[in-house]
Each structure stands twice: as C-alpha cells, then as structure tokens.
C-alpha cells in the first residue's frame, strides 16, 4: 500500500486510545468498515514505531496488531504484516516469524511477513528465512525470503555506509535499496537489468527502485515492461511502486494488469490499490468494475482504493485555488 494511503488513513481516525483502536482493527463489534479498520491499523503503527519514547505502548500496539492474524481478510492481514515491518520495532519479529511459518495462513500474508522481517533487518530471523527459502511450497514466499535474506545481509554489511544512495522521496522501507549512484545507468540499461531473469532478484529490485526514484514517464514505461515477468512477486512490486509514484502514465498498464483474470491475486490487488493512489479521473470507473470481483482480495482492494480515490479528489477540490 502506498504512503499516500497511509497518510490518508492516519488523518481520518478520531482520537482513540490503543484499546479502542484495537477493537476497531479486529472488528470487535462486527460493524467496522474495512476502511476504518485500515485507519486504526495505521494509527497503531504510529504507536508501535515510538518504541524508544514509549516502549510500553509500542509493545501493546504490536500485540494488538498481531491479533488480526486470526481474521478472515487476507488483504487486512497482509497489510498488518507490511505495517509491522515498517515500524522498525524488533518486538514484531517473533510474531512475523510465526506468521511466515504458519502454512495455514494465505501465501500472500506469509510472503508479506517474510518481507517485513527483511524490512526490520532482523538477523535473528535468518535461520527461519533460510528454511522457508529451501522448503516453502509457494514460489512467492520463497522469492520473498531470498530478497529478505539479501536485504538483511546488505544492511549489516559495510555497503550502506560505502554506497552513495539517492535520498528517497518516499518514507517506505523497501525490499531492496536503489542501485548506488556511483555507477551511471541510462534508462535502457536499467530496463534491461530489471528484466534480466538471470540476475539475482535483489539486484533486479535495486534497478526497480532506481527507476522509481528517477520518476519520469519514461521510467514508468520501463517499469511497466516488468509486467511481462513470470514472477507474481516481481509484478506485484512494480504495481506497488506505481502507487507510490502516483504517475498517470502508469494507469494504462495497471488497468491491463487488473483486468487479467488469470493473473495472481497479489498482483491484481496491488494494481487496484495503485489506481486508487494515483486517483486520476479515468481510474474511477475502472475501480468500480471490480467491486464485485469474485476474488476476495481484489474486491476488498477495490473498496479501499475507491475510498482513497474519493479522498484524494475531495481534497483536490477543497484546496483548488479560486
């Protein structure tokens, strides 16, 4: 989910204490709309991230978010895993390891738990990540473990201090850093590296995030070429990146991917959310087409994306100069 989504949801919750936020998140009364559950989640994330200033509340927030892993919503659980990884709070690592290893959870949730462990840079999770890399029955989980292991090893090497990295416009902790600035690449070179299936996935992701940070329409088109890749994980990350970039140049390719009935749900759901984040006029009727999609995670993503679309466009009207 894009940082625009997060900003929206953080701004739209009335003042609640942690227990009230938990009750909304887990839908204790059975009446909480999905969008409000996301709002509660991102407010709990804020508390969990403040583990140095308020460790007690941070630990509670992690625990309360973890209660959601018993929910039926694949979309919500996957978002909880993502959020836990973004908190930088290592107290979340045991919960994420348990979720990653739980074969009763949906693969999309387990993949997100593995990615979150990479985002945390948790060395204590390397053993379990290696185990999943070798033995997990789902390709997307194995590929995510490969990335998470590479990211943790990169983070704990001297590379972060030696490499010159572009200051990111985005607040997210990504599955891989962008390619270092020491070497100059033109767009064609980055596109070629992005699509080279012989190269390590971590390196291809680094090319992806370098293209994201370039941010031009030409970079969008180069990224869109990755939608032809066989890896659902890879394609879902491109859709996520498009949601961050907010470029209308991505709308045609996202629309095409969302419409692929044979495509993996994790890819289609991310395409829907990206269209909501971009919030262009032509995205609205597209998203409405999927409000009754037969795939739960796609249908729920369309609901959340429309909530975001309406927010972005109402703000645009409200703040438009006279």
Swiss-Prot record:
Its EC number is 1.14.99.29. InterPro entries: ARM-like, ARM-type_fold, Deoxyhypusine_hydroxylase, PBS_lyase_HEAT. Catalyzes the hydroxylation of the N(6)-(4-aminobutyl)-L-lysine intermediate to form hypusine, an essential post-translational modification only found in mature eIF-5A factor. It comes from the Eukaryota. It comes from Candida glabrata (strain ATCC 2001 / BCRC 20586 / JCM 3761 / NBRC 0622 / NRRL Y-65 / CBS 138). The keyword Phosphoprotein does not apply. Pathway: Protein modification; eIF5A hypusination. The gene is LIA1. This is Deoxyhypusine hydroxylase.
């Amino acid at each position: 989910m894009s940082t625009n989504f997060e900003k929206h949801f953080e701004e739209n919750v009335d003042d609640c204490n942690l227990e009230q936020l938990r009750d909304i998140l887990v839908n204790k009364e059975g009446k909480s709309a999905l969008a409000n559950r996301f709002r509660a989640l991102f407010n709990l994330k804020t508390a969990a991230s403040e583990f140095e200033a308020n460790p007690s509340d941070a630990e509670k927030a992690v625990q309360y978010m973890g209660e959601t892993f018993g929910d039926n919503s694949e979309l919500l659980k996957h978002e909880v895993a993502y959020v836990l990884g973004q908190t930088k709070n290592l107290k979340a690592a045991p919960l994420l390891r348990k979720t990653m290893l739980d074969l009763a959870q949906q693969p999309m949730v387990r993949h997100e738990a593995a990615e979150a462990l990479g985002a945390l840079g948790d060395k204590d999770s390397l053993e379990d990540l290696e185990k999943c890399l070798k033995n997990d029955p789902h390709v997307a989980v194995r590929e995510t473990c490969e990335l998470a292991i590479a990211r943790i090893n990169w983070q704990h090497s001297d590379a972060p201090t030696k490499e010159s990295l572009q200051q990111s416009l985005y607040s997210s902790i990504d599955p891989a850093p962008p390619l270092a600035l020491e070497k100059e690449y033109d767009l064609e070179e980055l596109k070629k590296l992005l699509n080279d299936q012989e190269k390590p996935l971590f390196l291809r992701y680094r090319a992806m995030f370098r293209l994201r940070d370039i941010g031009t329409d030409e970079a969008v088109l180069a990224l869109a070429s990755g939608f032809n890749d066989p890896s659902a994980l890879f394609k879902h990350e491109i859709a996520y990146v498009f949601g961050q970039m907010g470029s209308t140049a991505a709308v045609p390719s996202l629309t095409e991917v969302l419409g692929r009935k044979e495509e993996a749900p994790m890819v289609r759901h991310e395409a829907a959310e990206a269209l909501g984040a971009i919030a262009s006029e032509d995205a609205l009727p597209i998203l409405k087409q999927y409000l009754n999609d037969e795939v739960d995670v796609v249908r729920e993503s369309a609901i959340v994306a429309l909530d975001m679309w309406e927010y972005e466009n109402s703000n645009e009207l409200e703040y438009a100069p006279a």
